[in-house]
């Protein structure tokens, strides 16, 4: 079993590379670590690679990387994947700060890249914009969330943190409540991507920046139920939904089996569970129509997450 330690970076294709680079540097506050004609690599202010952008015909997320333990044997992992009928390839993609990667496709067609060697990219460089701490999680629309959850559990060692009814599952690979989410829909695509901020003041400052730049907040601020994170949502120039969050639940001891207690928890202790649809926020406004716009691939569901 693979057992990732954390999410690394996500790779996107875009028809307008300069526009998206400008958004991630000037608005999101990521650091442009390296760039050539058709690619750009962006790191957090801490120095971890977070986003790779490739020039392409369609706006989409193609690859997600995960860090595995430094002693991991890629040959042994490849043999384990082969037993599950999954083809893998050991590659060196010349990604700044990342060593060789073992790549394979998950059951929805996204490339997964495992790495065990990495280095910092100019940490603590001056930045503009928001300056998130890290890439926190990615959510996907999938036809069968239970089937995808089974793949991520059996093949990659993820654990289920929560369900909303039977259509939305949250999964973790470390202490963070979720690193991947899967919601039921008719066409597989990214639902949203999330960056972690330091605290509520950091989140408030990001809202002020959105106001200055006339970027609409399409949901929030609010406190979610599953994960209990404070969050806001907006769209980037490629019309993809971006979440900013802080105060996410943590499972600090897997054997105890409950999330680290917080005053806003409604269950004591707060354990993984199935939430009732439509009752999954502690407080805050409902999603705006703009949040749901162009999400025709998602089957009709009650208000989510």
PLM regions with names:
Residues 29-62, 106, 110-118, 161-191, ...:
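Conserved short beta-strand elements that form part of the metal-binding/catalytic scaffold
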Residues 21-22, 51, 75, 112, ...:
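Alpha-helical elements of the RecA-like P-loop NTPase motor core of helicases
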Residues 20, 24-25, 81, 109, ...:
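Conserved active-site tyrosine of GNAT-family acetyltransferases
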Residues 28-29, 82-85, 156-157, 214:
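Glycine-centered loop/turn motif at secondary-structure junctions
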């Amino acid at each position: 079993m693979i057992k990732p330690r954390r999410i690394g970076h996500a790779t996107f294709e875009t028809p307008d590379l300069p526009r998206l680079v400008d958004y991630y540097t000037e608005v999101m506050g990521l650091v442009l670590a390296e760039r050539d004609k058709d690619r750009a690599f962006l790191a957090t202010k801490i120095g971890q690679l977070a986003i790779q952008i490739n020039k392409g015909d369609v706006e989409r997320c193609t690859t997600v990387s995960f860090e595995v333990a430094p002693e991991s044997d890629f040959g042994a992992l490849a043999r384990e994947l082969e037993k599950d009928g999954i083809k893998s390839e050991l590659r060196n993609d010349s990604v700044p700060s990342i060593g060789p990667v073992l790549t394979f496709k998950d059951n929805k067609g996204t490339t997964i890249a495992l790495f065990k060697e990495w280095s910092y990219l100019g940490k603590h460089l001056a930045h503009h914009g928001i300056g998130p701490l890290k890439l926190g999680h990615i959510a996907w629309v999938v036809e069968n969330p239970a089937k995808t959850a089974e793949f991520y559990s059996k093949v990659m060692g993820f654990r289920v943190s929560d369900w909303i009814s039977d259509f939305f599952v949250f999964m973790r690979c470390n202490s963070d409540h979720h690193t991947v989410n899967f919601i039921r829909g008719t066409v597989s695509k990214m639902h949203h991507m999330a960056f972690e901020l330091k605290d509520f003041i950091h989140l408030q400052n990001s809202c002020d920046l959105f106001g200055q730049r006339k970027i609409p907040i399409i949901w929030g601020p609010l406190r979610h139920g599953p994960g209990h994170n404070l969050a806001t949502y907006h769209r980037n120039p490629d019309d993809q939904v971006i979440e900013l969050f802080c105060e996410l639940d943590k499972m600090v001891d897997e054997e105890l089996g409950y999330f680290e207690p917080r005053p806003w928890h409604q269950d004591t202790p707060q354990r993984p569970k199935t939430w009732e649809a439509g009752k999954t926020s502690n407080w805050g406004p409902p999603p705006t129509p703009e949040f749901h716009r162009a999400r025709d691939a998602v089957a009709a569901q009650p208000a989510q997450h």
